[in-house]
Amino acid sequence: MLLSVPLLLGLLGLAAADPAIYFKEQFLDGDAWTNRWVESKHKSDFGKFVLSSGKFYGDQEKDKGLQTSQDARFYALSARFEPFSNKGQTLVVQFTVKHEQNIDCGGGYVKLFPGGLDQKDMHGDSEYNIMFGPDICGPGTKKVHVIFNYKGKNVLINKDIRCKDDEFTHLYTLIVRPDNTYEVKIDNSQVESGSLEDDWDFLPPKKIKDPDAAKPEDWDERAKIDDPTDSKPEDWDKPEHIPDPDAKKPEDWDEEMDGEWEPPVIQNPEYKGEWKPRQIDNPDYKGTWIHPEIDNPEYSPDANIYAYDSFAVLGLDLWQVKSGTIFDNFLITNDEAYAEEFGNETWGVTKAAEKQMKDKQDEEQRLKEEEEDKKRKEEEEAEDKEDEDDRDEDEDEEDEKEEDEEDATGQAKDEL
């Protein structure tokens, strides 16, 4: 009897497990999101999120997300989900960000919190597990943050991951694996990867310089030395400047009035500069002394750097100078393939249409500005012509007045 491949894998216990979807939010049910997301009351002036697909989009309904709506504000909003631990499994955090306002300074990242977070008191100092996503502030800061809280300390990545800084929607993905490796993707393409231990300073270094080692006193690091047999020539020392032999005292020089005459100085053609003995290879050269290293007694490997006991809340805790950013398509799962597929089915489906709509708006705006410029120039030309006509009319009236005055003068003469 022949068995199908899926059945055979199932019998062998090798069938792929269904992905665990811990959190997914696409805002497809109108204002119902307000029942799932909690505004922090830690400050009274936190900015407000609104549901919007923005000024341009690929699909007006599918592209709706949480949009920051007030300039120069802190924002603090979060959603809770069933707590889970990522011990022994992959963690994938994914979402889309759209800075349609051409952001100059502001965050576009998310934070994952443990279950003990008081959502109504969430603020910038609330302890989190992971912070991930883009952050832009001026030309100097355009990075993707990947920050882990390790034993109560927030540890930043040692690499610089550049984020997207245009006005379109982009997909950000963080993958943390149980072998203590990670991967960062933008628009479903890898932009960084590596080892958690290598790319963050979670642990003390494996090796340290031997505190008992010291460079031997006779260790010579000079590759070249002065030739002891070389000596300075007897005629070497000449002054750098000498009196000009061609200079003559002016005939009208009065020493009582002008003081003693001194000829100007010139560069001495025989001047050779500072003498230095020639260099030879140092026969005692031993190379650069390298401080020997030993195993660091304070280093202890940690196979669970990646692991957290509790993930339970996803939060948007950020500052924006210019509002307008849209967050959408949140996903927390343990399945890398599912996350990639979800990204392709959301961001991937609407990205082209979004760009087309933006390009069309830009072209319409360009034509509108051209038409306004043309109209303004025509109005300016019309005003200039009207002013010129007025000047011509004034000149004609002045000429007529002068002619009338001349005629009157001539007539008066004739009468006389």
UniProtKB/Swiss-Prot annotation:
PTM annotation (N6-(2-hydroxyisobutyryl)lysine): residues: K64
Positions of region (3 X approximate repeats): 259-297
Positions annotated to bind Ca(2+): Q26, K62, K64, D328
Stretches that traverse the bilayer: none
Signal peptide annotation: 1-17
Motif Prevents secretion from ER location, chain numbering: 413-416
Region annotation N-domain: where it falls in the sequence: 18-197
Residues with N6-acetyllysine modification: K48, K159, K209
Stretches the record annotates as Disordered: 193-277, 350-416
Protein localization: Endoplasmic reticulum lumen; Cytoplasm, Cytosol; Secreted, Extracellular space, Extracellular matrix; Cell surface
This protein's record includes keyword Metal-binding: yes
Residue ranges with Basic and acidic residues bias: 207-251, 352-379
Sequence repeat residue numbers: 191-202, 210-221, 227-238, 244-255, 259-269, 273-283, 287-297
Tissue localization of expression: Predentin and odontoblast.
Region 4 X approximate repeats: start-end pairs: 191-255
Region of interest (Interaction with PPIB), ranges: 237-270
Stretches for region C-domain: 309-416
Binding residue positions for an alpha-D-glucoside: Y109, K111, Y128, D135, D317
GO biological process, one term: positive regulation of cell population proliferation
Domain of life: Eukaryota
PROSITE patterns: CALRETICULIN_1 (PS00803), CALRETICULIN_2 (PS00804), CALRETICULIN_REPEAT (PS00805), ER_TARGET (PS00014)
Assembly information from the UniProt record: Monomer. Component of an EIF2 complex at least composed of CELF1/CUGBP1, CALR, CALR3, EIF2S1, EIF2S2, HSP90B1 and HSPA5. Interacts with GABARAP, NR3C1 and TRIM21. Interacts with PPIB and SPACA9. Interacts (via P-domain) with PDIA5. Interacts with PDIA3/ERp57. Interacts with CLCC1.
Name of the protein this chain belongs to: Calreticulin
Organism listed in the record: Rattus norvegicus (Rat)
Organism ancestry: Eukaryota, Metazoa, Chordata, Craniata, Vertebrata
